[in-house]
């Protein structure tokens, strides 16, 4: 088995938000992800990079058990959130996903109003007891998603009527309305134009003050701009993980250097 390489910096246990040990994923007989060991830090943006099909999105979905929804998918090894095994039989995946929110590649607002898109999670999780409390949560989430000023006069309008970039910010507001501890983002800018992408990247930088953010991206430039730590996946393995500056300027594994320089991918 190939070694997993880490940066020199020693990370204390209380900085670690999510930890994976020997994480493996199977789709039926296909061994899609092998022996991933990684510590994801609190209030940090971590980027997952690598060629298409390398396992980065598969691993991202492990972190809030979205792979549970895929027939024939099996996850082995151990993944913890604040030290608790998220695959323990006593863990409710729905409650886990309130703590570990997710934003997908393509904006997917519910066929509801802007207001109801954001209010949906707090309602089903019982996070508010009154209309006033729901109003406060909705406004707060839209403000943190940098959408309040554009949406405050049209909260009853369909979320699907927003532009692509606005829809993605609405999906971010929806994800953070349940006060998660971690926000997973699977190529959140791939369907957006450069202006909307820049807005989302600025938002990601602001969100890390409150959340751990994990982003899958095919854009190495984006990973370099928004993340503090980067993990490079290749052929179902985590090849190298460390501080973003080190990964991009002084990678330790030749496969990482080959990918960053464009020789593989």
Swiss-Prot record:
GO terms for cellular component: plasma membrane. It is a peripheral membrane protein. Keywords: ATP-binding, Cell inner membrane, Cell membrane, Membrane, Nucleotide-binding, Phosphate transport, Translocase, Transport. It is found in: Cell inner membrane. Its EC number is 7.3.2.1. It catalyses: phosphate(out) + ATP + H2O = ADP + 2 phosphate(in) + H(+). SMART domains: AAA (SM00382). ATP binds at residues 50-57. Part of the ABC transporter complex PstSACB involved in phosphate import. Responsible for energy coupling to the transport system. This is Phosphate import ATP-binding protein PstB. It comes from Cereibacter sphaeroides (strain ATCC 17023 / DSM 158 / JCM 6121 / CCUG 31486 / LMG 2827 / NBRC 12203 / NCIMB 8253 / ATH 2.4.1.) (Rhodobacter sphaeroides). The gene is pstB.
